[in-house]
Amino acid sequence: MATVPQSTKDDLERRLTARARTGWPQVAGLRVRHRGAFAWIDAELPNGEILPLIRLRYLGSADDWGFGLYLASSGKYEDQILPTGSFTGTPEQALDCACELYLMAPDF
């Protein structure tokens, strides 16, 4: 399993923070944790609540990551298919997918 280079870790945090700022005003900040080939991303909401969102798996490219969604029902991350139909994609696609599920109010 590939270890994520420090430059890629830094780039990942920069990219996700920029995407959250422009696309998800409900997110006050992101917390990114790295271990081995994985990165876990949590959203910090304006009220201070921490919301686990995604787990990314480094596949050797800064633009193509495996995607796991946090499932509150089990407290675990499970590999998922992105809206593009792929199991892999950009970090921004993964963040958008999770935020659409967890932060958007349903239209009834």
Spell out what each predicted region is.
Residues 1-48:
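Negatively charged, low-complexity tracts enriched in Asp/Glu with abundant Ser/Thr
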